[in-house]
Amino acid sequence: MRLGVVTLFPEMFRAVTDFGVTGRAVKNGLLELQTWNPRDFTHDKHKTVDDRPYGGGPGMLMMVQPLRDAIHAAKAATGDSAKVIYLSPQGRKLTQQGVEELVKSDSLILVCGRYEGIDERIIQTEVDEEWSIGDYVLSGGELPAMTLIDSVSRLVPGVLGKKASAEQDSFSDGLLDCPHYTRPETLDNLDVPAVLLSGNHEHIRRWRLQQSLGRTLLRRPDLLENLALTDEQTKLLNEFVE
């Protein structure tokens, strides 16, 4: 998968390219990431990338010309089919379903805003979709972009090694994940549930599913509203409640 990022702080994306799951994906050629800095497209000695908004008000906006030229350069390098995404509080909220939609694209260009944002006409003419990671304010689009990259890359074939690793993540089936345990069997008088030590794979599967359903009910009941539970899931959830 090819990823382009338009950002004033390309150094931040070393966290993606040099570490963890995404770093291994880049090293193994499963993920290609390139950055474009609007400062490199300025024409003044100060490399100015901000400008005053029409109508006044506090703060500055990203200057149109350097930002637009950076986006055009990213498009030229990544391909005309690349989907351009602007990370924005006004965008569609990123969910696992959204991640599954985005991973179907061969290439994405992520535009990271700074200051008070970007000119609305850039959004109208250059951006295909706006995405948000939540209803709160950040200093820029870099952290949301890294969040999106990390979540999407986990679904790229070969990145996690085992397909089941992604399938068992929280939200992969619309539910929160079940509890997990490792050694020792007893920690501060708390024991690993006996079913996980039984070796009975069917019992373990049902226990994990029931715990996943129960945890979702207790912590994120809103998720259950959008799910059509199977007969087995309904039975296990009823048993959990009882």
UniProtKB/Swiss-Prot annotation:
Q: Does the keyword tRNA processing apply?
A: yes
Subcellular location per UniProt equals: Cytoplasm
Q: Which SUPFAM superfamilies does the UniProt entry name for this protein?
A: alpha/beta knot
Record's Pfam families? tRNA_m1G_MT
Going by the entry's taxonomy, the superkingdom of the source organism is recorded as Bacteria
Q: How does it assemble?
A: Homodimer.
| Function field | Specifically methylates guanosine-37 in various tRNAs.
**Name under which the protein is recorded:** tRNA (guanine-N(1)-)-methyltransferase
Question: Which species is this record about?
Answer: Shewanella sediminis (strain HAW-EB3)
Q: Which gene encodes it?
A: trmD
